[in-house]
């Protein structure tokens, strides 16, 4: 995400994932990143965050427990993970002179921080969703990995969500039907499906998600993004 002021935010940056053929190339070329936002500690969401943080000096934005675990267990630079950029559910961080507001909201999922040595997961607190609001710009709701839950309806009481990034893959998160119901609870202008197709187990598809939105009479626009695609809003 690039703000109107030119600042760069990454959310769950797994550039070297199996479906991004240019991932290693993009990772090597990455230079300017201001903040890395991480929703929970699973390896497919922490992704390349530590490497990028060390390389670019990007500050880590995460819940207090996850931030501490990423510093102690994964080696994220401690000077880039302080109280300025750590918080918890219901709290809002004011970044870049209030140009960016980040609010932590719940997600229903696991959160253990995993290492490459097959050791047991390390406590990483609770998983989160993120609301990212840009000054004089759109507000995004990134659900993180989650199931549907009724408190999603509270999001729209405090935030007008323009774009909802919603997991649809099934198996480890909600699938298309439950994701469509989540969209109805939040009522965003645009819904962008995510967290599907990376592994065989993630069987949910954008087409199925679109059909479920139609069944529910959703007024939200469905926007399906290709890997590596950029959109301007």
Please give the residue ranges for each predicted region:
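Zn-dependent metallo-beta-lactamase
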Residues: 1-10, 15-19, 101-108, 208-215, ...
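Pre-active-site segment of Zn-dependent metallo-hydrolases
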Residues: 3-42, 47-54, 74-78, 110-122, ...
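Beta-strand-turn-beta hairpins that frame and shape the catalytic cleft
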Residues: 3-9, 92-102, 133-140, 232-233
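Active-site neighborhood of phospho(di)ester-bond hydrolases with catalytic His/Asp-centered motifs
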Residues: 10-13, 33-41, 61-64, 140-144, ...
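Active-site environment of divalent metal-dependent phosphoester hydrolases
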Residues: 18, 43-47, 67-70, 91-94, ...
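Glycine/small-residue-rich loop that forms an oxyanion/phosphate-binding "nest" at active or ligand-binding sites
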Residues: 49-55, 61-91, 100-112
């Amino acid at each position: 995400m690039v703000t109107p002021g030119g600042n760069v935010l990454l959310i769950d940056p797994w550039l070297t994932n199996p479906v991004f053929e240019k991932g290693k190339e993009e990772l090597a070329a990455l230079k300017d990143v201001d903040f890395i936002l991480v929703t929970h500690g699973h390896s497919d969401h922490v992704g390349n965050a530590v490497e990028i943080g060390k390389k670019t000096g990007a500050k880590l934005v995460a819940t207090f427990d996850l931030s501490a675990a990423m510093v102690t267990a994964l080696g994220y630079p401690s000077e880039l993970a302080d109280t300025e950029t750590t918080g918890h559910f219901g709290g809002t961080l004011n970044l870049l002179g209030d140009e960016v507001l980040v609010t932590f909201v719940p997600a229903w999922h696991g959160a253990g921080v995993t290492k490459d040595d097959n050791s047991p997961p390390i406590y990483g607190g609770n998983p989160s969703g993120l609301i990212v609001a840009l000054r004089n710009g759109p507000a995004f709701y990134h659900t993180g990995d989650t199931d549907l839950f009724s408190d999603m309806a509270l999001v729209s009481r405090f935030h007008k969500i323009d774009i909802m990034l919603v997991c649809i893959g099934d198996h480890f998160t909600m699938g298309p039907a439950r994701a469509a119901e989540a969209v109805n609870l939040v009522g965003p202008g645009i819904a962008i499906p995510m967290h599907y197709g990376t592994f065989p187990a993630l069987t949910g598809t954008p087409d199925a998600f679109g059909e479920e939105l139609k069944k529910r009479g959703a007024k939200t626009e469905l926007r399906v993004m290709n890997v590596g695609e950029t959109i301007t809003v």
